Amino acid sequence: IIICIFLLTLCPLVTLQADDLTQTVSIVPCPVQMVSGTGHFRFSGGTTLVVENAEQAKVVRNFINLFTKAAGFTPVLKTGKMKGDVRFVTDKSLKSEAYRLDIIPEQITVRASDVKGFFYALQTIRQLLPPDIENHHTVNALWTVPCLSIQDEPRFGYRGLMLDVSRFFLPKEYVLRIIDCMAMLKVNKLHFHLVDDNGWRLEIKKYPRLTEVGAWRVDHTDVPFHSRRNPLPGEPTPIGGFYTQEDIREIVAYANARGIMVVPEIDMPAHFAAAQAAYPWLACRELEREVPGYFGGRVPTLHGIRDWNRSACLGKESTFQFIFDVIDEVCELFDAPYFHIGGDEAPKDEWKKCPHCQAKMKEMHLNDVEELQGWFNNRVLEYVKQKGKRLIGWNEILAAGNLDPSVIGQYWTPKRDKNVERHIARGGDVILSNHRSFYFDMTYGQYPLSYTYDFDPGRYHISPRSYDHVLGVEAEVWTEWIDKRPKLDLNVYPRMQALAEVAWSAEERKKYADFKERLEAFKPTLDALGIGYAVTSVAEPGTFQRQKPRRLFYCGDTHYELKLNEERKAKGEK
């Protein structure tokens, strides 16, 4: 027995045999501790799930709906202290989000201290069921789970995925599908990048031109992102879309029901070109312009100018009134305690020449344009704080010496940033999103799957003694190089599974070879969900095989890996 327990604790991928039934125990992310039992528990229409209260019932109802769709029967849900086949028991000795799961042939017992823990226990049971549980049509199967005991809790409280819908707009239904997969993998924060140079994606009732103008651009999808030309005046703008405020309420409610917090990002003061196309007075130079199809500040105007005039003018009070009005409406829609302002890659040359910005610097006794942005960030922070929110920004904002230390810095840059270290030393908090491990827009030739799985905070000079100031990790799905949903699926899966394990599983439990085996067992679940993914040879190419996709990407062929993946899947590769 001791040997069995030892093997299961170290090797989460285990095949159990009982009553002529063979099932593989394969859970992503890997639990903290798992011990095998004997036999299996079977779900049926007569299975009774007993909860203690309405809050638990709400979580369990979504789990029961899986059986209604895929199995053709609906287990019974009851509230109270009666006997049941699946019992939910509050145990205040467990941490928030932690759970204990005990499965024997006659009963399943789920223990947690809060509804989050109960939810994550159900996601583990969901993965223990046959993959057909994810189908939306009735399947004839044995709906069983193996007997075992699990004790589990997350490594980080903040386990995030950022979705850039500015560069490549995603319909609401696709966002909901991503939320479903995040929930199954215990990823609990959706960072919604709603605004950038290339599109404003959120309805703001006080400023209708943000979506009438700012949400649409010229169709350049047949041209590599970095080769796109300036739009011409009056050229049709069919590419884009936006979310109505009702759409956002639906997305937030759907996510909340699945244990996911939606964190809005309104990028400011840079990456503001779409807003300036709608309202030119937001810029230092009030030129008419179109929504660009490119990034990096090559902002086209009606005068044929390509310049860096994409930062909001920080010297005009009208800019702040606009921003505060937008914040008011955004905070009514999102209940997260965070508000992300981006703040990265802010071109500052305009501020050096702008009479409004220079007058403001003189008035506020600011030494340079870095301090001007720091002053801007602090002013927005104070407004956001009044709304009960905490400000998040990319780590470039930490360069300002006058920044309020309550800001959360999101550390994305590939190299060591001493401003991050200084921020932590002052008691500031950070989220780790380092480029090498967590930029899912990159090809696998550039950053193979192992780069995500092998993430190590120490590589970025985050020492263990600073971990109290690390809220968690987040991966970024930028979409400059993504213009098809199959391409997005390819880039995200199986990287999201690796992200989940980095964010949830204890460091000593992680073993890449074991993860790859469990990943293979997870792929039928993705198939059942209709989600595309990179096959093994694409996600983890050899050193020589990495060269071609990387070279072609830099030459503008962003679809090479997608085509290669489709060819290999057609040949039966997983």
Give, region by region, the residue ranges found by the protein language model.
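Feature activates predominantly on carbohydrate-active enzymes
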Residues: 94-321, 325-338, 354, 379, ...
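Active-site neighborhood of glycoside hydrolase catalytic domains
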Residues: 275, 300-303, 307-406, 413-422
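Bacterial Sec-dependent signal peptides at the C-terminal "C-region" and cleavage site
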Residues: 10-21
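Flexible, acidic glycine-rich loops studded with aromatic residues
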Residues: 391-407, 413-574
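Flexible loop/turn segments at secondary-structure boundaries
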Residues: 57-58, 169-171, 197-203, 269-275, ...
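Bacterial N-terminal signal peptides
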Residues: 2-12
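Contiguous, structured surface segment used for ligand recognition
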Residues: 19-156, 487, 502-536, 552
